[in-house]
């Protein structure tokens, strides 16, 4: 016959076994879980009255019902000696960690038995590489058992006797709860932790504090889950080394021709905000630099050699940095081109929305903003501006023919102003290049010349002339134009200057120097506010700040909670010492006497550290394997070098013939 099962009383006081409400003298309360039990329905009730003071219920004492055990445990005999022996064997296994021992014992007692090692290895193989950062499961509310919302670390009271004076100190019990659930629990009149039943101090009841470290960790974990769930955005990017030599179109192009074409390979190694001529050292392909008179069939080809980078805009520049280049395309009727100098109109004032990209009507005034301000800044500082003339300028005798764009050297902006009427920003460009212009037969470049007479300056407004010496000027001693002041430092990086192998090594070095994995970011959120490292034995103060237990204790080492005082041989009343939190003015003197480790936070940190160590060990093994292959290649290098030396003359001849 199967013996009856032991059940406690329900919240209304009715015994769940006999279905009757026992009187108070026949009910017994557990000292751990504070659960009422019916004495008559207990299989082994306490024998004496003194035993009831420290009585533990069957659930807390571990007393089990003599029921038949299912599954694997069923074969261990009626008394359970075999089951106890199996548990002892698990405890004696030194190869298992405490967590693994607990898992095996739980499987054994639940009737599932011990999972075969082969099955565990198979599960590890299938889940390898797909293990998420399971942080949310460690941070669950003690009441609603859901993920924490506005987490509060619960503090409890315990007695502390010092100098024959009793204090009640509050310290975290290591359990967390949602702020809403905690306030609801307190509103029902409870003054104990929902997990360990320890008493909660009145200061926490009236003023609970949110643990910001747990908030940050939960937020990062949720971001990582969303990033894994959603598909990554497809970015169509082609590295400069992989681009063709000419502009190209892809299957994503909506229109034919160069309307939706992509730029070809950039042949010069200059940043996009480079000022002045392009020298030979920035031309690794031809080793001659950008020469005056070079021409191209379109703006995309002009871009590839760095003369003018924008595809559509006629001005390349930044309002806070200056203008690098302009294109003369005859877009305004007032533009005048005299070769060595010209009048240039700024941008703006036209409605170009929708299909009005070719609108030539000025709708409003131009102002010195954006590109116009960039030109004015180059005028103020005397920067050289690269000038490209287009065949679209039908009124200029200096424009190239045959639908080409031609690089005509560098110019300097001497003046800028606005004309009356519909105000337009105007700029006076004067040539200042060391190479002769394409339309002259001179063998030398420009020389300093007087400024031309511009009649419209008599009616100009907002006239601006350079007062200081220009950065790009003529050096009489060297008889050439050069930078008289240091050129402005570039604000944009040069892309793809290194070889592919060098770029790969550089990316790996940057990645190893700046780890930005989600686990590393989570560990960073769990740093101690004193040592600024990942916490060991984390403790949470009453003001919701987190520290290492050792750091906090060493911070107040040697400071007693009570300070004895005396005056003139008389003993005064003892005074309590004030120990302020390292992060705020809150007094944590009682807390420091016996800080309790926040177990939930400690488990998360330990798990993240373990996963990080596994990843580092895996990457180290891969690095050693790749290092071995590199060493083998280094051993073979002398043979390759001898072979290259024998073919040096042949390769040089081939290169020379190709250049011709």
Curated annotation (Swiss-Prot):
Q: What is its EC number?
A: 2.3.2.27
Name the catalysed reactions: S-ubiquitinyl-[E2 ubiquitin-conjugating enzyme]-L-cysteine + [acceptor protein]-L-lysine = [E2 ubiquitin-conjugating enzyme]-L-cysteine + N(6)-ubiquitinyl-[acceptor protein]-L-lysine
Zinc finger (PHD-type) boundaries: 12-63
The residues covered by the YDG domain are 285-434
Q: Where are the zinc fingers (RING-type)?
A: 141-197, 528-585
Pathways per UniProt: Protein modification; protein ubiquitination
Q: Where is the composition biased (Basic and acidic residues)?
A: 610-621, 637-646
Looking up InterPro entries in the UniProt record yields: PUA-like_sf (IPR015947), RING-HC_ORTHRUS_rpt2 (IPR047529), SRA-YDG_sf (IPR036987), SRA_YDG (IPR003105), UHRF1/2-like (IPR045134), Zinc_finger_PHD-type_CS (IPR019786), Znf-RING_euk (IPR027370), Znf_C3HC4_RING-type (IPR018957)
Q: Which CDD domains match?
A: RING-HC_ORTHRUS_rpt2
Gene Ontology cellular component list? nucleus
Query: Which GO biological process entries does UniProt record here?
Result: chromatin organization; protein ubiquitination
Instruction: List the coiled-coil residues.
Output: 593-622
Where does the record say this protein resides? Nucleus
| Superkingdom of the source species | Eukaryota
Annotated function: E3 ubiquitin-protein ligase. May participate in CpG methylation-dependent transcriptional regulation.
Write out the domain note. Answer: The RING fingers are required for ubiquitin ligase activity. The YDG domain mediates the interaction with histone H3.
The name under which this protein is listed is: E3 ubiquitin-protein ligase ORTHRUS 3
For this protein's source organism, the top of the classification is: Eukaryota, Viridiplantae, Streptophyta, Embryophyta, Tracheophyta
In the UniProt record, the gene name given for this protein reads: ORTH3
């Amino acid at each position: 016959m199967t013996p009856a099962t032991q059940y406690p009383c329900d919240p209304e006081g009715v015994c769940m076994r006999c279905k009757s409400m026992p009187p108070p003298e026949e009910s017994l309360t557990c000292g751990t879980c504070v659960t009422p039990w019916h004495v008559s329905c207990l299989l082994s009730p306490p024998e004496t009255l003194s035993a009831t003071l420290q009585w533990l219920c069957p659930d807390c004492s571990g007393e089990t019902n003599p029921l038949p055990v299912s599954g694997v445990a069923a074969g261990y005999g009626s008394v359970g000696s075999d089951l106890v022996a199996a548990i002892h064997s698990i405890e004696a296994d030194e190869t298992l960690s405490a967590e693994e021992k607990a898992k095996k014992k739980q499987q054994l007692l639940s009737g599932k038995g011990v999972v075969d090692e082969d099955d565990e290895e198979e599960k590890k193989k299938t889940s390898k590489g797909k293990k998420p950062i399971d942080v949310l499961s460690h941070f669950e509310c003690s009441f609603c058992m859901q993920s924490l919302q506005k987490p509060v670390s619960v503090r409890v009271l315990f007695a502390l006797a010092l100098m024959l004076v009793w204090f009640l100190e509050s310290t975290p019990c290591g359990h967390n709860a949602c702020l809403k659930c905690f306030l609801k629990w307190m509103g029902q009149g409870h003054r104990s932790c929902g997990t360990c039943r320890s008493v909660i101090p009145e200061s926490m009841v009236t003023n609970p504090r949110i643990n910001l470290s747990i908030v940050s960790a939960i937020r990062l974990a949720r971001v990582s889950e969303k990033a894994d769930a959603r598909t990554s955005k497809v970015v169509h990017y082609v590295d400069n080394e992989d681009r063709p030599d000419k502009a190209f179109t892809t299957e994503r192009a909506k229109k034919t021709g160069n309307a939706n074409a992509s730029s070809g390979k950039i042949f010069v190694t200059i940043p996009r905000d480079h000022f002045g001529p392009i020298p030979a050292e920035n031309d690794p392909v031809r080793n001659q630099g950008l020469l005056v008179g070079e021409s191209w069939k379109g703006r995309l080809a002009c871009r590839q050699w760095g003369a003018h980078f924008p595809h559509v805009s006629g001005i390349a520049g930044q309002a806070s940095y200056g203008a690098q280049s302009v294109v003369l395309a005859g877009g305004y009727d007032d533009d005048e081109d005299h070769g060595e100098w010209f009048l240039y109109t700024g941008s703006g004032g036209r409605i170009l929305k929708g299909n009005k990209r070719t609108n030539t009507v000025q709708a409003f005034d131009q102002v010195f903003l954006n590109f116009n301000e960039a030109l004015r800044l180059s005028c103020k500082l005397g920067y050289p501006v690269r000038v490209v003339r287009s065949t679209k300028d039908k009124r200029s005798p200096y424009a190239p023919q045959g639908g080409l764009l031609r690089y005509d050297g560098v110019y300097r902006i001497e003046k800028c102003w606005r004309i009356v009427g519909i105000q337009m920003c105007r700029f006076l460009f004067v040539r200042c290049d060391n190479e002769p212009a394409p339309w002259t037969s001179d063998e030398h470049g420009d020389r300093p010349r007087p400024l031309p007479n511009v009649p419209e300056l008599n009616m100009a407004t907002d006239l601006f002339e350079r007062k200081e010496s220009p950065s790009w000027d003529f050096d009489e001693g060297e008889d050439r134009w050069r930078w008289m002041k240091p050129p402005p430092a570039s604000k944009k990086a040069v892309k793809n200057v290194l070889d592919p192998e060098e770029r790969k090594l550089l990316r790996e070095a940057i990645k190893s120097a700046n780890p930005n994995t989600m686990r590393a970011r989570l560990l960073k959120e769990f740093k101690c506010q004193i040592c600024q490292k990942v916490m060991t034995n984390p403790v949470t103060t009453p003001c919701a700040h987190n520290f290492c237990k050792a750091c906090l204790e060493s911070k107040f080492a040697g400071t007693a909670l009570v300070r004895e005082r005396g005056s003139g041989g008389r003993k005064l009343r003892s005074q309590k010492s004030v120990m302020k939190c390292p992060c705020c003015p809150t007094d944590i003197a009682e807390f420091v006497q016996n800080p309790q480790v926040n177990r939930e936070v400690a488990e998360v940190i330990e798990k993240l550290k373990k996963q990080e160590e596994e990843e580092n060990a895996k990457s180290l093994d891969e690095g050693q394997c790749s290092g071995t292959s590199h060493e083998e290649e280094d051993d073979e290098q002398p043979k390759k070098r001898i072979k290259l030396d024998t073919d040096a003359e042949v390769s040089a001849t081939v290169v020379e013939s190709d250049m011709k």
